Amino acid sequence: MGAALALLGDLVATVSEAAAATGFSVAEIAAGEAAAAIEVQIASLATVEGITSTEAIAAIGLTPQTYAVITGAPGAIAGIAALVQTVSGVSSVAQVGYKFFSEWDHKISTVGLNQQPGMALELFNPEDYDILFPGVNTFVNNIQYLDPRHWGPTLFSAISQAFWHLVRDDLPRLTSQEIERRTQRFFRDSLAKFLEETTWTIVNAPINLYNSIQNYYSALSPIRPSMVRQVAEREGTQVTFGHSYSQSIDDADSIEEVTQRLDLRNKEANVHSGEFIEKTLAPGGANQRIAPQWMLPLLLGLYGTVTPALEAYEDAPSKKKRRMSRGSSQKAKGPRASSKTSYKRRRRSTRS
């Protein structure tokens, strides 16, 4: 027993020195993770740089003794465990320790699972149970939150937590939505009141271009410029074709008369001033909000309350000719034919 303890002490001291030299923990060296990492480094260096394993060990800063301790620590632990089993009969402790270090990521104990099948662990999927039994998750959550033995404090704690989550998560979201809604409503209301209270003026600028084009083509004379030039040459006068001749050129006696009439028309005052739309007060003196009929679809559109009747009024319903079938046309022609025949019969009767 003393020899086993001495070997174990020497192994612990050696592993501790190797851990201090390499930076790995004792558990990593005992589990073999340090040896695996060092072997990967050595293999990569030997493959990339084309050096031997001894040179690779020296390149990463390890001595052959330290490398031997790191690679032989797991086997030495297993050998000491077997020695302790033969000497003192405490093999279970060594076996469990060696298995713990070799399988470091194992976190669930499997002792007694074969002897007690009812202790086996299974995955819990609450979604499946909620599909089979709707509402079971809510019931389970309430049971977990409320303790039947101390239902008062647990109920107060659950309510306070729910209120805190409401204040922390839901209240800022609701507040931002309400602020956004109020801002939009205020902007639309302000714009609608501005459109109601402002002074509107009729402006014909967009249609002036079309009116001028219409006037130009309507004022063109049916007489060609070549004919006008011939008349001017015959009378010995000069004609400037920059002028647009009026419709009365046909009844003019000479080119001078045409030019005089053109100058007189240009001197006439051409009024393009706008007319203000008169504001009317609310009927009955109730000081209600009023708006012209042509502005009503715009204001209701800002408030989002456009009715189908206003849409039809604004867009103007499409006028489609109703097609008549042959049967309906024949039926329509029937009374006319009968009236004609009766008229003919009456004429015949009068002749006879």
Curated annotation (Swiss-Prot):
Keywords: Capsid protein, DNA-binding, Host endoplasmic reticulum, Host membrane, Host nucleus, Host-virus interaction, Ion channel, Ion transport, Late protein, Lipoprotein, Membrane, Myristate, Transmembrane, Transmembrane helix, Transport, Viral attachment to host cell, Viral ion channel, Viral penetration into host cytoplasm, Viral penetration into host nucleus, Viral penetration via permeabilization of host membrane, Viral release from host cell, Virion, Virus entry into host cell. Pfam families: Polyoma_coat2. One of its GO terms (biological process) is monoatomic ion transmembrane transport. Residues 342-352 have a biased composition (Basic residues). Residues 312-352 are annotated as: Disordered. A lipid is attached at residue 2 (N-myristoyl glycine). GO terms for molecular function: channel activity; DNA binding; structural molecule activity. Residues 313-352 are annotated as: DNA-binding. Signal peptide: none annotated. The chain crosses the membrane at residues 290-310. Residues 273-308 are annotated as: D1. GO terms for cellular component: host cell; host cell endoplasmic reticulum membrane; host cell nucleus; membrane; viral capsid. A motif (Nuclear localization signal) lies at residues 316-324. Belongs to the polyomaviruses capsid protein VP2 family. This is Minor capsid protein VP2. It comes from Simian virus 12 (strain wt100) (SV-12).
